Structures are given as structure tokens and as C-alpha cells.
């Protein structure tokens, strides 16, 4: 297995979130490792959260498993049941179909770096705290189905 040169993979902070939901993830930088390495059966991202940044809006996936491991720094995991501090070496997992909305918030003063892996067919998902859903064709809509 060849070593992956992270510096050769573009690091971006794009988001498809409509305003104002895009503001919370402005300090999230990520590299999509799967496409750059030829992996096609699951997604893998190398993510850096700058202090104050969120990984996403609090969300869930209808048909996608998600697994995360913190490499360095720390972040607050926010879920339906409350908050849990994650530090380097900690892992978290959400099976497909779980509606336990989740995200990370970097509430510290150092970067938090993590790997997140997702597998399964994209059939959309939801957002716990805001009026937004994500569709299977990669669109953001209000919970009543009207587009942003």
C-alpha cells in the first residue's frame, strides 16, 4: 500500500450549505482522500478544524455509516444526548439510519485534526437544529421540501 502524500491533495474549505449555515464551517479545511487514491467503495476525509470551527451542522445520514478518529487536538462532540470531549486517539461511530444528529465543535485554542470515513449509498439525511434536509441528489432543502 503506497503512502499517501497529504500535501499533494488539495485542501479546501468549500461547503454547499446555504447562508447563514455556511458561516459555522468557515474554519473547516478538508482533503477528500478517497477520490485522490482511487478508493470508490467508501469516502475518507482528512479534516482540520481551526479554533471556533464546526465540522458541519449537526446532522445524520439516512443510509450511510460514519466513523471518525481524532488524530490531534480536541473537539466537543455534540449529539442528541449531550456533549462529549474527544481527544487524540478517540473514536466515534454512527450507523446508517441513526437519527442521532452529531457534529464536532473546536472550542479550544489549537487545531483539531481527524479522519472521517463514510460508507453506504447517499440517500440523504437531516439536520437536527435547523430547517434543512439533504437530498439524495445533493441538494439542500427546507424540511417541507422547498429549495434554498
Residue ranges and their predicted role:
Residues 80-96:
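Short acidic-glycine-tyrosine-enriched beta hairpin
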Residues 1-41, 125-148:
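A short, N-terminal "cap"/entry segment at the start of jelly-roll beta-barrel domains
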Residues 38, 96-123:
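Ligand-binding loop in jelly-roll beta-barrel domains
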Residues 50-54, 74, 83, 98-99, ...:
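Short, charged/polar surface micro-motifs in flexible loops or helix N-caps
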Residues 46-50, 61-78, 117-119:
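Short, conserved beta-strand element in jelly-roll/cupin
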Residues 39-44, 62-65, 70-72, 87, ...:
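Short connector loops at helix/strand junctions that flank enzyme active sites
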Residues 30-32, 45-61, 99:
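Conserved short histidine dyad/triad with adjacent acidic residue
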